[in-house]
């Protein structure tokens, strides 16, 4: 009887043990996190339902997604995403499971762009290209040093402007009676320019708060000293500066105002904005990690031509020289500019700007001096941006920084 009892007891114990080990895991509603990051990267916070968990990062993402041990604690998991310098978007899915088990506690989808800014987040607020006339002559000086561009953070979040490219001169001239060759319109793919300058920084140096603006000037001098009609540009955020090859045409540098990084300008002397706006302006965000040397090597504008309708009645096919191309996908904002009655061709594609802003009713109109083009403000307090500068801008209006 004792032996039988022992056998039964052992059998019952074994059955009970098997029953316990076969119990299903306690279920849980997994946390779902979806995060879209800019190229700069950053942290992703996951509030896991339990403290004991395993983090499963796919092998192909392990080089750019890691656990941020310093900031993770208890149920709070922090994933660190590195800067994206691949030149393309990337994504991954990280699963968080119960420790030693297969039960999913959280699913984290991470998508990362290869750029730091999106189109429309920064817009061109104002372009002052005409120059300020001297009281004595009624004309500005030839250097046009008090020219400026205002660039607004038109989004709802604070953004970094590091690396932003300014195209200060389009390859096409809106004041030339010309047209593109059918089937060879490069504007559908890119913006052609011949002057490129970038905002310096390492990614998180130039913070622009939501609704605030950067002022970029030709020369950051107090221009009222020589011209009482002008303005004091010494408080500008940046200036563009050129090392001239001609000692008779030298630029002026203000050491207290940071210079833009010059990538290229076709002029061998001093870069200015066209004083009638015939060469348009745009801002862009190149891929993270792209250098000036790479840009010049990889993005020349080749075999571009247009037809010029000469005043003598003849048409000429002309090459577009000394230009580089910026893919339209990089463009944050582009503004076609010129004279009201002497505007013939749009430097930028209609998808970027279907209209144009202007100063001066005709070519050479002296009434344009002291005037600029200023983007309108909507009822929500943001700048209007419909990609049509005819509607979006107040043209031929007094420059905002001229008192």
Where are these regions (language model features)?
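Bacterial Sec-dependent N-terminal signal peptides
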Residues: 1-40, 45, 101-119
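Surface-exposed binding patches on compact interaction domains or structured appendages
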Residues: 48-78
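Short, hydrophobic/aromatic beta-strand segments
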Residues: 52-58, 158-167, 177, 226-227
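Short, surface-exposed loop/turn segments at beta-strand-coil junctions that are enriched for proline
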Residues: 82-88, 222
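A short beta-strand micro-motif common to beta-rich folds, especially ectodomain repeats
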Residues: 88-100
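A structural motif detector for short, solvent-exposed N-terminal "entry" segments of globular domains
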Residues: 113-175, 265-279, 284-308, 312, ...
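The feature marks short-to-medium sequence segments in extracytoplasmic or secretory-pathway proteins
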Residues: 164-197
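Solvent-exposed beta-edge/loop recognition patches
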Residues: 186-402
């Amino acid at each position: 009887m004792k032996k039988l009892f022992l056998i039964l007891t052992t059998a019952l114990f074994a059955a009970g043990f098997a029953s316990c080990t076969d119990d299903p895991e306690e279920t849980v509603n997994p946390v779902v996190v979806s995060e879209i990051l800019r190229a700069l990267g950053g942290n992703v916070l996951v509030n896991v339902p339990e403290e004991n968990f395993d983090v499963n990062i796919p092998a192909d993402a392990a080089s750019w997604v890691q656990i941020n041990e310093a900031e993770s604690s208890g149920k709070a998991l922090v994933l660190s995403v590195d800067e994206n310098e691949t030149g393309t978007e990337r994504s991954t899915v990280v699963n968080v499971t119960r420790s030693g088990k297969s039960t999913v506690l959280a699913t984290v989808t991470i998508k990362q762009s290869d750029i730091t800014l999106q189109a429309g987040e920064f817009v061109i607020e104002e372009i002052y290209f005409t120059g300020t006339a001297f009281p004595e002559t009624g004309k500005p000086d030839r250097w046009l040093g008090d020219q400026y561009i205002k660039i607004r953070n038109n989004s709802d979040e604070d953004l970094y402007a590091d690396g932003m490219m300014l195209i200060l001169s389009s390859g096409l001239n809106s004041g030339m009676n010309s047209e593109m060759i059918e089937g060879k319109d490069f504007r559908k793919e890119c913006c052609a320019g011949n002057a490129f300058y970038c905002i310096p920084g390492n990614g998180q140096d130039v913070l622009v708060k939501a609704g605030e603006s950067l002022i970029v000037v030709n020369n950051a001098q107090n221009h009222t000293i020589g011209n009482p009609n002008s303005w004091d540009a010494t408080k500008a955020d940046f200036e563009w500066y050129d090392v001239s090859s001609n000692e008779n045409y030298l630029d002026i540098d203000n050491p207290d105002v940071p210079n833009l990084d010059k990538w290229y300008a076709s002029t061998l002397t001093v870069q200015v904005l066209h004083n009638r706006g015939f060469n348009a302006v745009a801002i862009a965000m190149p891929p993270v990690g792209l250098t000036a040397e790479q840009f010049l090597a990889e993005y020349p504008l080749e075999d571009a031509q247009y037809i010029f309708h000469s005043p003598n009645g003849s048409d000429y096919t002309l090459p577009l020289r000394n230009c580089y191309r910026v893919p339209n996908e990089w463009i944050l904002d582009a503004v076609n500019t010129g004279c009201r009655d002497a505007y013939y061709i749009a430097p930028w594609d209609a998808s970027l700007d279907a209209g144009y802003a202007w100063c001066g009713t005709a070519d050479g109109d002296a009434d344009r001096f002291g005037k600029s083009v200023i983007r309108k403000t909507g009822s929500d307090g943001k700048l209007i941006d419909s990609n049509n500068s005819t509607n979006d801008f107040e043209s031929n209006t007094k420059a905002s920084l001229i008192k």
